[in-house]
Amino acid sequence: MIKLGTHLSIAKGFANAAETAVYIGANTFQFFSRNPRGGNAKEFDEKDIIKFQEIRKENNFAPLLAHAPYTMNLGGTKDDVYEFATRVIDEDIRRMDSLGIEYMCFHPGSHVGGGVDFGIDRIVKGLNNAIKGDENITILLETMSGKGTEIGFKFEQLKSIIDKIEHKEKIGVCLDTCHIFSAGYDIVNDLDGVLEEFDKVIGIERLKTVHLNDSMMPFGDKKDRHAPIGEGKIGLKALIDFMEHPSLKHLPFFLETPFDDEGHKRELKMIKEILSSK
């Protein structure tokens, strides 16, 4: 069975998000581990969490994915920004693990002029301080588009981070189709080649989740602009082929497309109908 969901808001609680997932035809979902542009995290509501776990179990949800906030930058030069990022990643690993969330992804960071090697060293230090080794959750580095001074738009950069992680069994990769297309990996015309390169550089076993997004921007443009599935430069056929690839079809897929719940419901229905007709 395909593991397919979208990004959902938990502003009205985890149970509400889980109910929304069921309503739109998803069997998993992604959510922000805290306000994506804010600071402190809200305390969990016990009744909400109990109901959330019941819905999750009753509907046999696939692995869930938390997304760390955008304000978190482990790769930069400003010490106050770095200290905030290290606190957030440490807290949110603990918070998400307590809920039994299987994965948490994050944007590795931007070096903002410090240089790639400097940024990677900062990211590694932050992760090694946060990952204790006794967690059940797996932390995922997200593939990036390469805008500005982003780190993680080349597979080699992700490998450089992973190689220095102490508890390597707790680290993986979340592949974003829009991002890698924008970064110059041709998943439209050479998907096998891209996956072979990923396997050679990082190891395909490290790939745990997929952000399934089309791209508003052309190939190699290094800009992060998501488009609805089939309405961008990647196209419907390439994204369906991606989902059906033998090395990928077992993974959970999460849409981050610019739709509301009703739009996502239609989008999920379209994808499932195409997959089931083959």
Curated annotation (Swiss-Prot):
Record's keyword terms, sorted: DNA damage, DNA repair, Endonuclease, Hydrolase, Metal-binding, Nuclease, Zinc
Binding site for Zn(2+) 2: 142, 176, 211, 256
EC number: 3.1.21.2
Cofactor dependence: Zn(2+)
Protein origin, superkingdom: Bacteria
InterPro entries: AP_endonuc_2 (IPR001719), AP_endonuc_F2_Zn_BS (IPR018246), Xyl_isomerase-like_sf (IPR036237), Xyl_isomerase-like_TIM-brl (IPR013022)
Alphabetized CDD domains for the sequence: AP2Ec
Binding-site residues for Zn(2+) 1, renumbered to this chain: 67, 107, 142
Catalytic activity: Endonucleolytic cleavage to 5'-phosphooligonucleotide end-products
Manner of cofactor binding, per the entry note: Binds 3 Zn(2+) ions.
Database matches in Gene3D superfamilies: Divalent-metal-dependent TIM barrel enzymes (3.20.20.150)
Keyword Isomerase: no
UniProt GO BP: base-excision repair
Pfam families assigned: AP_endonuc_2 (PF01261)
Binding site residues for Zn(2+) 3: 179, 224, 226
MF term (GO), any: deoxyribonuclease IV (phage-T4-induced) activity
Family according to the record: Belongs to the AP endonuclease 2 family.
Function in brief: Endonuclease IV plays a role in DNA repair. It cleaves phosphodiester bonds at apurinic or apyrimidinic (AP) sites, generating a 3'-hydroxyl group and a 5'-terminal sugar phosphate.
Protein name: Probable endonuclease 4
Source organism per UniProt: Clostridioides difficile (strain 630) (Peptoclostridium difficile)
Gene that produces this protein: nfo
